[in-house]
């Protein structure tokens, strides 16, 4: 994450956006949604392994999909309504 160019999104905003839409959780499902053109916005956890987040961030840039960072995997998991942390999630069409 390049903190000079990226903004950490408030978890309340993430929760609200995900509650209003369909979404996928996890790197594999998210990459599939990006490649199929279904992802509207991607959420990545700042404390997730860069081996997971960096390829997804690159795909977001390639497919011109908005990317938002969330402070932690626990926060992102909570926003998705799951009991474990999540490295990545996406609002989909």
Outline where the language-model segments fall.
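Ribosome large-subunit tunnel/peptidyl-transferase-proximal elements
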Residues: 2-38
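Flexible, active-site-adjacent loop/turn segments at secondary-structure boundaries
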Residues: 12, 16, 21, 50, ...
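Amphipathic coiled-coil/heptad-repeat helices and related helical stalk/stem segments
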Residues: 26-27, 52, 72
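Fold-independent oxyanion-binding glycine-rich loops
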Residues: 27-28, 46-47, 92-93
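Short, flexible micro-motifs
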Residues: 29, 40, 80, 84
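N-terminal positively charged helical leader segments and presequences
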Residues: 32-57, 64
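Short basic, glycine-rich beta-strand/loop surfaces that mediate nucleic-acid
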Residues: 58-93
């Amino acid at each position: 994450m390049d903190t000079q160019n990226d903004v950490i999104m408030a978890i309340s905003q993430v929760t609200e956006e995900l509650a209003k839409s369909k979404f996928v959780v996890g790197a594999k499902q998210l990459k599939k949604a990006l490649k199929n053109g279904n992802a509207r916005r991607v959420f990545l956890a700042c404390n997730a392994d860069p081996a997971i987040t960096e390829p997804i961030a690159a795909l977001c840039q390639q497919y011109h999909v908005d990317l938002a960072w969330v402070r932690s995997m626990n926060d992102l998991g909570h926003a998705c309504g799951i009991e474990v942390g999540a490295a990545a999630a996406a609002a989909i069409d």
